[in-house]
Amino acid sequence: MTRRTHVVQSNGISRGPLIDSVRPYPEAIRFALNRMNGSSFWAYSLWRAPEEADLLDDIPLSDEYIQSAGSAEAMTLELRRLEADGSAHQYVIGKPGGEQIANPAEVISWDDGRHSTRVHPHEVFTADEAAEVFYAYFLTDAVPAPYVLRELSLG
């Protein structure tokens, strides 16, 4: 059995280890993201568990993660990471080549429309596009080039 190294969370409440016993990790991530419907399943998060964590005993939270919200057809991706000074920063992930207009115009809704956010057109992902970013994060704990990050002001 493969050692479980990452935690996944659905809708901000249900979490457990990412497993590869049914599908390889890249396909497990893609399968989950493609099930997002914006209604009963509208958010998916992934983070690395601490090295010493026993995911059969405890499912720890983390200050660093990648998350998505929306549906398989249109979702937003965000990265939360700790910077060198220890401060937490959150970013919207975008595809390369997008234009940063003053006010984001694309609306991503989730939880039956109870929540929404506005993003730029290049910050809207399909489930298959998002799966590539999530799997890269799974491997490296980072969002790879050529994707771009736009910092969010959460305060």
Where are these regions (language model features)?
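Acidic, proline/glycine-rich low-complexity IDRs
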Residues: 1-46, 69, 80-155
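The feature represents the first ordered module of a protein
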Residues: 51-88
